[in-house]
């Protein structure tokens, strides 16, 4: 095997998805803890001790205790390299999560034992389904009372439409929690509360028949457990690697992230069975990770990761070949050669200069406004990775300054923050309004906060008469010009220079579509085909 094939085979690149408050950020911390990437996990709730979760690095996230940007963290474990992409925990940031899911090879779904499958989980699962992403499931908060585990499996299968294969099974729950049984190895892991946020190895018995186990958990509970396991193993599906990798079956684990319990079996199983980097589609052909020439695509842009440097970083997933510091690449969309100097690797907000990177790795490229989400970099071949869309926003607001002299800073701030993809910035052709589009109200709060914190701009967002937006295209230049002339009052330009129809009502949009049959109105814009404004 070549170096590229060997290194690609070692990579495990995945994202964690969940409904808000299911314990995703805490579990992220504990995976890092067990992976040896951090010595002490920070509790998101532990405000007085000034402990904040490693993956919640932005000031606003630390204040609110929610993840609103996706972090990238890498750590070695058992001879493999794990790339963990944390996703926004808030529903308003679903588009960012969608794009993160285009950059991973598998996902870990976290479910609250008391709440079961929630609305956000359903939506995220639909996104994973589009790509047949392999998914493992961690049922969290076992230290609290919750739903019957058998009912939970049934709920996952019925609501999410995916077969469950339990790998660990709980012994009790809440106050009666004693541990979990590993259904494949037969081992029993006893529950001990994690203290001081440091890793603790649980006591493990080799089987249910091991001497001393009955004393630990009680004869009655052991008898109940044997009966329950007989029922579970008779009614559930055994783990099938092919079905899991095809996105048809999810291995299920039980545990308590906050108490470091049940995390180790999950991590070990993940390392052994999760897929390495896979072949990916481009506009021209399929690209295999084992190819020797570098290729990769940008799935996220983050402004001001280091407030002292006012920098913008483009996150690029390496799809094939080897990245080396300072190498020359082709920025396919612009057709220009770009030297990738000072690329970064990440441990949440800790950054290091990347000497090399392989398929499955994520590197950060310094961006001075020339890189967009969806851009492809290669060693010369003109191809673009597909399937990284921009969705039409559902809410629109006009930005208004409290200090009119700060207009330039406002324009710069809105343009740079919209590059990240969570919001979209539009300039109407016939007015000087600056319009921001988003899929949720929280995004306007975040932008207002960051404008003030990072750009020194005090802006408010007020209602504007725009209900929806559609990107417009027409192969006939003359007909497009006619359309622009007739509809100038409803047209604008997005941050990438694309023409957008800003409809005041859905009826208005319908009429515009009927009157211009040659013009295509699109609810999404594929980043791969976007043109940047100079």
Curated annotation (Swiss-Prot):
<dbReference type="InterPro" id="IPR032090">
    <property type="entry name" value="RF3_C"/>
</dbReference>
<keyword id="KW-0648">Protein biosynthesis</keyword>
<feature type="binding site">
    <location>
        <begin position="140"/>
        <end position="143"/>
    </location>
    <ligand>
        <name>GTP</name>
    </ligand>
</feature>
<feature type="domain" description="tr-type G">
    <location>
        <begin position="9"/>
        <end position="278"/>
    </location>
</feature>
<comment type="function">
    <text>Increases the formation of ribosomal termination complexes and stimulates activities of RF-1 and RF-2. It binds guanine nucleotides and has strong preference for UGA stop codons. It may interact directly with the ribosome. The stimulation of RF-1 and RF-2 is significantly reduced by GTP and GDP, but not by GMP.</text>
</comment>
<dbReference type="InterPro" id="IPR041732">
    <property type="entry name" value="RF3_GTP-bd"/>
</dbReference>
<dbReference type="GO" id="GO:0097216">
    <property type="term" value="F:guanosine tetraphosphate binding"/>
</dbReference>
<keyword id="KW-0547">Nucleotide-binding</keyword>
<dbReference type="InterPro" id="IPR027417">
    <property type="entry name" value="P-loop_NTPase"/>
</dbReference>
<dbReference type="GO" id="GO:0006449">
    <property type="term" value="P:regulation of translational termination"/>
</dbReference>
<dbReference type="InterPro" id="IPR009000">
    <property type="entry name" value="Transl_B-barrel_sf"/>
</dbReference>
<dbReference type="InterPro" id="IPR038467">
    <property type="entry name" value="RF3_dom_3_sf"/>
</dbReference>
<dbReference type="InterPro" id="IPR035647">
    <property type="entry name" value="EFG_III/V"/>
</dbReference>
<dbReference type="GO" id="GO:0016150">
    <property type="term" value="F:translation release factor activity, codon nonspecific"/>
</dbReference>
<protein>
    <recommendedName>
        <fullName>Peptide chain release factor 3</fullName>
    </recommendedName>
</protein>
<keyword id="KW-0342">GTP-binding</keyword>
<feature type="binding site">
    <location>
        <begin position="18"/>
        <end position="25"/>
    </location>
    <ligand>
        <name>GTP</name>
    </ligand>
</feature>
<dbReference type="GO" id="GO:0005525">
    <property type="term" value="F:GTP binding"/>
</dbReference>
<dbReference type="GO" id="GO:0005829">
    <property type="term" value="C:cytosol"/>
</dbReference>
<keyword id="KW-0963">Cytoplasm</keyword>
<dbReference type="GO" id="GO:0016149">
    <property type="term" value="F:translation release factor activity, codon specific"/>
</dbReference>
<dbReference type="GO" id="GO:0003924">
    <property type="term" value="F:GTPase activity"/>
</dbReference>
<comment type="similarity">
    <text>Belongs to the TRAFAC class translation factor GTPase superfamily. Classic translation factor GTPase family. PrfC subfamily.</text>
</comment>
<dbReference type="InterPro" id="IPR005225">
    <property type="entry name" value="Small_GTP-bd"/>
</dbReference>
<dbReference type="InterPro" id="IPR031157">
    <property type="entry name" value="G_TR_CS"/>
</dbReference>
<dbReference type="InterPro" id="IPR004548">
    <property type="entry name" value="PrfC"/>
</dbReference>
<dbReference type="InterPro" id="IPR053905">
    <property type="entry name" value="EF-G-like_DII"/>
</dbReference>
<dbReference type="Pfam" id="PF22042">
    <property type="entry name" value="EF-G_D2"/>
</dbReference>
<dbReference type="Pfam" id="PF00009">
    <property type="entry name" value="GTP_EFTU"/>
</dbReference>
<dbReference type="InterPro" id="IPR000795">
    <property type="entry name" value="T_Tr_GTP-bd_dom"/>
</dbReference>
<dbReference type="Pfam" id="PF16658">
    <property type="entry name" value="RF3_C"/>
</dbReference>
<feature type="binding site">
    <location>
        <begin position="86"/>
        <end position="90"/>
    </location>
    <ligand>
        <name>GTP</name>
    </ligand>
</feature>
